[in-house]
Regions:
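Non-heme Fe(II) oxygenase catalytic core, chiefly the N-lobe of the double-stranded beta-helix
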Residues: 1-121, 127-134, 138, 153-158, ...
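Conserved double-stranded beta-helix
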Residues: 97-149, 153-226
Length: 226
């Protein structure tokens, strides 16, 4: 049994209205030029600092795509990913709190340092648009725009394994290189990196994976000159 994961988008919530970089990203939305808004225009997204507190469960890197790779077969009703496959739906989410039926002290469930929630109460049309991806076989991979609304369906009668890995597309840029250096420092100590809870399971492990065990690809990913 799994409660699933409610509909949301990642990479900041209240921050999408407040941060100057996000105000550039969504300028055409806020200025009323919706026809000119291009969710694929990535300029200024690498300048966003949406999560500045370490050791949460929020991803602070810039992701062109979020990715879901199945480690087991995944069937309908067994925790499949659901999406609203319309990146432009972010415009609806951003403008929704400004409509007349929303109290002045309410932002449709939004809070700082969290994911951006999408709910039946405030976004019924978007909830209605949530669509399941097809069944997956182990090894299949699914990718979606970083603004796409997504959820994971609850499971009441689990049939076999249901395992996936979240693997984003995180291109090299200053923002991601800064995080890579944090991961390098954490690996040297055997500590949990910044976007994960401070659990530090491996700190005292003998024979744990170290920087010396990295191949050329691992070194490049952590910004280490090979």
């Amino acid at each position: 049994t799994s409660k699933g994961l409610g509909a949301h988008t990642d990479s900041g919530a209240l921050e999408r209205w407040l941060l100057p970089a996000y105000q550039h990203v969504f300028a055409n939305v806020f200025n009323g030029n919706l026809a000119k808004y291009d969710p694929w225009h990535a300029a200024h997204r690498t300048e966003v600092e949406e999560y500045t507190v370490d050791n949460t469960t929020k991803c602070s890197v810039f992701r062109t795509f979020q990715g879901w790779t199945a480690l087991s077969d995944m069937l309908p009703g067994q925790g499949l990913l659901h999406v609203v496959p319309i990146p432009e739906a972010m415009a609806y989410v951003l403008l929704r709190p400004l409509l007349d039926d929303v109290p002045e002290d309410e932002l449709c469930g939004v809070a700082p340092g969290r994911v951006l929630p999408v709910s039946e109460q405030w976004h019924p049309l978007l909830i209605e648009a949530l669509t399941s991806i097809p069944k997956l076989e182990a090894g299949d991979s699914v990718w979606w725009h970083c603004d796409v609304i997504h959820s994971v369906a609850p499971v009441e009668n689990q049939q076999g394994w249901g395992n996936v890995m979240y693997i984003p597309a995180a291109p090299m840029c200053e923002k991601n290189l800064a995080y890579a250096h944090k991961v390098k420092a954490a690996l040297e100590k055997g500590a949990s990196p910044g976007d994960f809870p401070r659990e530090d399971y491996e700190t005292n492990w003998e024979g744990r994976f170290t920087l010396a065990d990295l191949n050329i690809h691992g070194k490049r990913a952590l910004g280490i000159d090979s």
